[in-house]
């Protein structure tokens, strides 16, 4: 009986921690912070050039591991579009779902560019990804007052 009481208390404490955590972050926040943001960064960090005083540096992946990282990010973006489109998460049906499905297409294009090791196409896809992100954030980002 003592063990049962201990497990009950442990369960209550676990639930309290879970509910506190979910109150601080929305599902959309967590989806963005832990899935989409890192996936987008994998694409943006692998396309284009950085110019510094030391010179110009190409961000294109130089090995299979680098291209695989881009492919992973592309798949996460593509498949996350379905998570965003779930009825419980859709802010409004038309525009929200359209922007979510735009991510699907962009993820597929990024994956294809990585498969072909096409850094120029990946750069274009990265620009398109940025535009979709900005369009969504301008419309739906909840600003704290």
Q: Which residue stretches match the model-derived regions?
A:
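The canonical Cys-X-X-Cys-His
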Residues: 129-140
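Hydrophobic h-region of N-terminal signal peptides that target proteins for export
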Residues: 10-18
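Short Cys/His-rich "knuckle" micro-motifs
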Residues: 143-145
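Sec-dependent N-terminal signal peptides
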Residues: 6-8
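Extracytoplasmic c-type cytochrome modules immediately beyond a signal peptide or single-pass transmembrane anchor
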Residues: 19-127
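Positively charged n-region of N-terminal signal peptides that target proteins for export
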Residues: 1-4
């Amino acid at each position: 009986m003592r063990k049962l009481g201990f497990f009950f208390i442990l369960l209550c404490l676990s639930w309290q921690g879970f509910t506190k955590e979910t109150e601080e972050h929305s599902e959309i926040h967590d989806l963005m912070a832990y899935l989409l943001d890192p996936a987008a960064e994998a694409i943006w960090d692998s396309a284009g050039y950085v110019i510094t005083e030391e010179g110009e540096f190409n961000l294109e992946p130089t090995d299979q591991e680098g291209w695989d990282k881009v492919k992973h990010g592309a798949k996460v973006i593509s498949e996350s579009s379905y998570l965003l489109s779930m009825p419980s998460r859709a802010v409004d049906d038309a525009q929200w779902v359209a922007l979510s499905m735009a991510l699907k297409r962009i993820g597929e294009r990024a994956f294809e560019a990585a498969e072909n090791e096409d850094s120029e196409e990946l750069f274009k896809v990265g620009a398109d990804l940025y535009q979709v992100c900005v369009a969504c954030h301008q419309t739906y980002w909840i600003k704290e007052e």
